[in-house]
Amino acid sequence: MRPLTPRQAEILELIKCNIAETGMPPTRAEIAKRLGFKSANAAEEHLKALAKKGCIEIIPGTSRGIRLAQTEELEEQGLPLIGQVAAGEPILAQEHVEQHYQVDPNMFHPSADFLLRVRGDSMKDIGILEGDLLAVHKAEQARNGQVVVARVEDDVTVKRFEKKGSTVYLHAENEDYSPIVVDLTNQSLSIEGLAVGVIRNGDWQ
């Protein structure tokens, strides 16, 4: 497969995530809105380029006529590794992707959608250490007790999730850290994904 431009890679990632979350690909208008294009026509041009490179198939006559090409080359791209996440930006925005690791997403359950570089030691007591690569399954909801990647206002954090009424507690696994308390009546919180595994940085090159 021919190499992708950064913008093409970003659109391909958006398509894959949309299918994983909703079961269907985005429309051209949705792609344009998510990525700041002035019109759906701009998205269409990028889709045509992705089709020429063998990443997707375009199905005429339908607004969601995009199908991922299940090629060996596409699978070999691996999981995107997310580094520092800028405030207010989508976690899978192309500028956050440091590289791709040749990791089989299905070695985790549920399957991983991306890797997140761990910063800090707030989860060290359950073996999530500074510099580790956290395998994350993209999700928008969580059950109490699950370890989540959460966005509180503009900050992204990895913590254990607990919800009581309209209050969410994001617990560290390190006694040196107090829980992050989020009042959902006046603070924004979104779940970016669920932790499904850890790769010790250096063990997978």
From Swiss-Prot:
Q: Which residues bind DNA?
A: 28-48
Gene Ontology biological-process entries:
DNA repair; DNA replication; negative regulation of DNA-templated transcription; proteolysis; SOS response
The answer, when asked if Transcription regulation is one of the entry's keywords, is yes
Q: Which GO terms describe its molecular function?
A: DNA binding; serine-type endopeptidase activity
UniProt keywords, alphabetically: Autocatalytic cleavage, DNA damage, DNA repair, DNA replication, DNA-binding, Hydrolase, Repressor, SOS response, Transcription, Transcription regulation
EC number(s) per UniProt?
Answer: 3.4.21.88
Cleavage (site feature) positions: 87-88
Q: What does this protein do?
A: Represses a number of genes involved in the response to DNA damage (SOS response), including recA and lexA. In the presence of single-stranded DNA, RecA interacts with LexA causing an autocatalytic cleavage which disrupts the DNA-binding part of LexA, leading to derepression of the SOS regulon and eventually DNA repair.
Q: Which PANTHER family match?
A: LEXA REPRESSOR, LEXA REPRESSOR-RELATED
- The protein's name is LexA repressor
What is the scientific name of the source organism?
Answer: Shewanella woodyi (strain ATCC 51908 / MS32)
Q: Which gene encodes it?
A: lexA
